[in-house]
Amino acid sequence: MYYIMFLYNMLLIIILIFYSIVGVPIIIFNNNYYWDPDIFLFIIYYFIKFIIIFNLYLYYMINYIVYTPSGSPPGRGTYILLYNMLYSYNMFIDYVMKFITCVTYMYLMFWLLSPTPSPYYVSEVPVS
């Protein structure tokens, strides 16, 4: 039973890694006419997703190295830990990622669209 769960989890992890790598160009270059105006949202969102997923796997590998005796198969605790990290906290991680993405996008748009002392901006000011 646990071996079937392990194979199922490994299949989902392989699919997750595949779509994490392939899904970004599909979303970005899907439109043949012009780039989406939300290209910055996609870039920020998937960059944060990569960081969070990488931190999850790093934490899992550290847990695997520390709590698995050498020369023995991994215990059920590491698999249950990976299951909890990938599925139980999935919605919370997505919420955090969307929040960070929106805040970063708002700050980026404010920084890009705020009036700065450029020649075009200065030339529009009437000289008295």
Swiss-Prot record:
One cellular-component annotation, GO: mitochondrion
Keyword Mitochondrion assigned: yes
Mitochondrion recorded as keyword: yes
Domain of life assignment: Eukaryota
Location relative to the cell: Mitochondrion
Main subcellular location: mitochondrion
Protein name per the record: Putative uncharacterized protein Q0010, mitochondrial
